[in-house]
Amino acid sequence: VEREVIISAGAFNTPQFLMLSGIGPRDELEKHHIETKVNLPGVGKNLQDRYEVGIVSKLKENIPLIKGMKLRPPEAGEEADPQFSLWLQGEGPYTTNGATVALIKRSKPDLPDPDLLIFGLLGNFRGYYPTYSQDIGKEENIFTWAILKAHTNNTNGCVKLRSSDPCDTPDINFHYFFEGANTEDDLESVINGVETVRRIIDRCGDLIEKEIYPGEAIKNREDIRSFVMNQAWGHHASCTCKMGPSSDLMSVVDNRFRVHGTKNLRIVDASIFPKIPGFFIVSAVYMISEKASDDIIEDAMQDDL
């Protein structure tokens, strides 16, 4: 390698690439008959994410701002979405991120920082699955409260190899609400978030016809607990190649993003966080990318001297 190889494949594929190249936990590599080049036990460990759930309600009538919105391209012969022409002029709801209201709060009053982001979305959003983007706008008069739990405690997720075939997907296990991982507080916080949303809905008067998800069958706190444990999702996977000193056996990169025990190899993506940051990780990813670019340029200039 004339300069460097920089891996930016994300929390799932970055550890997969390393392990396929012989960099990772020795026992995991031997299981797939991969020669160990660098024994780094932390590769693929420490997988973290948020906990999120959605509470979906049917409105008695559509919000005037979104009247006629289809949230999808029109079908053949169908009337065009009136909000699309507004978007072309830089106006209307399509110029926003789709959230109409947001609330940041502490799930418990004794917490040092807010840990819940509760925001209202247009459409039917119950999480991420293959057809979720089509389902969001299938019905009119639907409103979703999304609840996101930040500062999660679970660090027990992991990414492993299914095989030595680079075309095979990695084995990903978040170990959501893993017993013994101090995640009971996380679960209680999400439950508190659901109860907060229901109190908000109760105060909306004639706007809401009924809650359709999880619905009337989910009544008490134990019902909510089961709902959250079965339905929570996340989309901020990170921390599988964490940054730390070489004395930390579970760290993978140093403070300049260089992979321990290697030369000319760096990782620059969300996998390097030791702990998942903030509410949304995108700003933190921008920040580490800026730092990495400075480090790479600085090191390259020194090498050229």
Regions inferred by a protein language model and the residue ranges of each:
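Mid-to-C-terminal "cap/lid" subdomains and adjacent gly/pro-rich loops that border
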Residues: 15, 25-139, 188, 192-207, ...
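C-terminal segments that line or cap access tunnels to active or ligand-binding sites in enzymes
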Residues: 104, 126, 142-209
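A glycine-rich dinucleotide-binding beta-alpha-beta segment and adjacent secondary-structure elements
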Residues: 119-121, 129, 140-146, 205-276
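Core beta-strand elements of the Rossmann-like FAD/NAD(P) dinucleotide-binding domain
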Residues: 1-4, 8
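Glycine-rich, N-terminal phosphate-binding loop of Rossmann-like dinucleotide-binding domains
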Residues: 9-10, 21
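A conserved FAD-binding loop/helix module that cradles the flavin
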Residues: 275-296
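Active-site rim elements
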Residues: 3, 40-41, 85-94, 145-147, ...
